[in-house]
Structures are given as C-alpha cells and as structure tokens.
Amino acid sequence: MQNLTISIIQSDLVWEDVAANLKAFTKKIKAVKQSDLIVLPETFSTAFSMNSEHLAEPMNGKTMTWMATMAKEKNTVLAGSAILRENDHIFNRFIWMRPDGSFDKYDKRHLFRMGDEHNHFTAGSERLIVELKGWKICPQICYDLRFPVWSRNKKQEYDLLLYIANWPEVRIPAWEKLLYARAIENQCYVAGVNRIGIDGNGVNCSGNSMLIDSKGDLIWKAKDLEEETKTVKVSLDDLNGFRKKFPVGMDADEFEVI
C-alpha cells in the first residue's frame, strides 16, 4: 500500500478579498515541495462571510480557475472550500481539484446557525468519498465535526477524514477533543485544517490544525496563532494493520438514519 503525503496550510485570511487571498495562497502553495494533497482552510478565498449573495462565484469563476491552475502547476490535488453558486443556490462548497482539471465537490451539510449560515447558504445532502493513491478520503467542513453520525465509518468506507474550518479560538477545546474522537471512533486518520487571524466580525481563530492517527495519537499539531505549512506522510499499511488487530467496527451498533 502506498503512503500518502499531505500538506496542510494554516493561514490567515483577508476578509472578503478574493484577489488578496488567492495571491497569498499562490505563494504558499508554490513553496510546497512534492505532495499528493494540499489542503486549504474553509472559505479560503473570502473567509467565513455571510455576504454570500455578493461573494458567490460561478463554478467557472476566478476561484475555481485558480484552483485548476495551481493543481496542474504543482501536479497535486488541491482541496478547500469556497462560496460558490450553482443552479440558483449558494453553497459553502468543498472542492477536490485534480491536476487534470477534473474535480469532485461536497456541500457543507451542517450550516452554523449561530452564525446565521443557514439563512445564507443551501445545505448539502450527500457525503463525498474520493480516492487518491489507493486511499479513500472523506472531506467535511467545520461545524460538520460536531455530528458523528455524518462521519460514521462502520464499514471502513474511508481511511482519512478531512475537516477544513474557520473554527474560533474560544471553542478550540471542543475542536481538539472532537478531532480525537472522530479518529478513534472511526478508526481512521483525521486531519483538521483551520485558519488563524481575526475575521470581519471580530472572531479570532487560533489555528490548532492537527493530524491524528487511528489510535488517537497526535502525529502533528500546528503552532497556535501562527501561519504554518506542514507536509506529513501517513501510512495505509499502519492503518490497516491496526484495524485488523483491533476490529471494533464488528461490535458497532446498527441503526438507520431516517
């Protein structure tokens, strides 16, 4: 089984300024050495703004074009979410952009009502699992982290659970505990990619991006309140070996979501 090289970019975001954010991420991405997957935070081109009618881009707009260009240039998968419009709906949409310009998408399922997100975006209804180098990867977005049924992995449908976020510093204890819980209960690697900095509403995000293995052991954690890019290699053999040795999924409860 092949190892997977993941590059996590923990960055500040410029409020509602697509050009400034894409310029900053271009520099950061170009500095990454060879990597299979580069991951950006939630709403990386605008920050977490509810000004969705003004900020929403079409699927062939500036952010999507930029993602395709960068993925091709670096010969890597580039992932992150943006405010995108399709069929008269606006989504907080995760994009999995491949070097050949093809992509998959996942629309944030759980919209953060305490920030009024549910009144400015359309919720997604389908989970996404993508494949890369023999790995199966399930991307989710920020508030999705609080809902374990949505990430349930009883049949080992995926190997890496990927969360991108604009998670505030005041709730970082929950962020960290929930990331560990998702890794342990789903017997998978979990990567949490968060932004830093103060947004346009005065909310401070401290980062605390993390990579955790299926046993609940910390592989890497970013520095608080600092921009950082980290490239880490993870092993599918290690994951499968632990799953075989400790098959807790065989005793998991059955239930149906209606």
Model-derived regions: residue spans:
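Active-site-proximal beta-strand elements of phosphoester/diester hydrolases
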Residues: 3-13, 17, 105-107, 135-144, ...
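Hydrophobic residues at beta-strand termini and immediately following loops
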Residues: 9, 106, 130, 193, ...
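Feature marks short, surface-exposed loop/turn motifs that line or immediately flank catalytic pockets
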Residues: 12-15, 46-47, 238
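Cys-nucleophile CN-hydrolase/nitrilase-fold catalytic domain and related Cys-dependent amidase chemistry
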Residues: 18-19, 23-99, 104-105, 168-182, ...
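CN hydrolase (nitrilase-like) catalytic-core segments centered on the catalytic cysteine
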Residues: 62-77, 146-229
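Short Pro/Gly-enriched beta-strand edge/turn motifs at strand-loop
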Residues: 77-80, 108-116, 190-194
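Short beta-strand scaffold segments in enzyme catalytic cores
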Residues: 80-82, 93-97, 128, 192, ...
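Active-site catalytic loop in hydrolytic enzyme cores
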Residues: 85-156, 170-177, 235, 241-248, ...
